[in-house]
């Protein structure tokens, strides 16, 4: 609702928060596509924003050096003649590798992450998701113009690129500038790629 006010949008504008941490932007993007296709509205604004410094434990050197604050946004338009977004969504809640203890009780607390477990999970999950999306769309790695990876860890990105033989000019890293900005990570990458002219109308992008 703050955005509706600040942007002076009509009162029938649909505004809501979606909290899904690092997957937040992807969930929001898919949700926006569903909303646009189910209504007569033409455009949607998807924003990924994080202020992780508020919940960072600055005494935990294994965690505090990883995260950063950031925000990015994209305008989404859906047309009948355009292909829809082919999304693979899911969750893995059996092992609390990344958590903010006390949140469920409304107690202010700081973020905690088991870095080794998260790394091992991501190294397996990223290729799995790539395989699923390519299989769903009937495309190959060569058909993809650009790969937009969540900027959580440079090694995870490099391992995925090595596994699929993705050339350096087809993926991008900015984690060295901002750290892991969670839900803001992907729109920040998209914004920089757009500014550089790397992706544009008609680009086939795997996020």
Predicted regions and their residues:
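Flexible, glycine-rich active-site loops centered on histidine and acidic residues
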Residues: 35-70
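Phosphate/ATP-binding catalytic cores across multiple sugar-kinase/actin-like superfamilies
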Residues: 125-136, 159, 163, 189
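Short beta-strand segments
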Residues: 19, 43-50, 76-77, 88, ...
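Condensing-enzyme catalytic core mediating Claisen C-C bond formation in acyl metabolism
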Residues: 58-124, 128-131, 204
